[in-house]
Amino acid sequence: NITLYTYAELESLDGFIGNLKARIRRKSKGIDEKLCTGCGLCTTKCPVKKIPGEFDERMGNRSAIYVPFPQAVPNKPVIDRKNCTYYIKGKCRICEKVCPTQAIRFDQEDQITETEVGAIVVATGFTVKQTDFFPEYGYGKYPDVITGLQFERLASASGPTFGEIRR
């Protein structure tokens, strides 16, 4: 059996292959995944919409409650506590008001899970090479000099320009 922990970090790992004890921090998403249907109403009604999206290499915007990337598993939103008006000022809660299943959980905290496992697959993603190491290409100086990853996001049908290359 495979258990998938998304939006989580491995805190510690003890034991040996085949007999491991894992301590996993499951970061708060601010939603109840069992109640959320992934309808997207909360993301469309959120008034905070000008946050540069990490997945689109900051070339497109997202709201304070958002699905981290297309085809996310599970395809459900997370609340960005650093940009959410409720967490900053104690006001708003529009996402909570419009949610048809009452899945928003502003009081949700990180959870620590300890489990015994035989093996672990860690999918950490990647780190993009910093462009300031190559000043001769003019990245940051000329607006039309972009990284390969930025070009990939622009060319993608799910990207900030819906696949239309325009600069």
Model-derived segments and their meaning:
Residues 1, 5-35, 47-146:
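Non-heme iron-sulfur electron-transfer modules
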Residues 33-38, 157:
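Short, charged, solvent-exposed linker or helix-capping segments at domain edges/interfaces
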Residues 37-40, 163-167:
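Rossmann-like NAD(P)H-binding beta-loop-alpha module
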Residues 84, 157-164:
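Short, glycine/charged-enriched hinge/interface segments at domain edges or termini
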Residues 141-158:
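A nucleotide-sugar donor-handling region in carbohydrate enzymes
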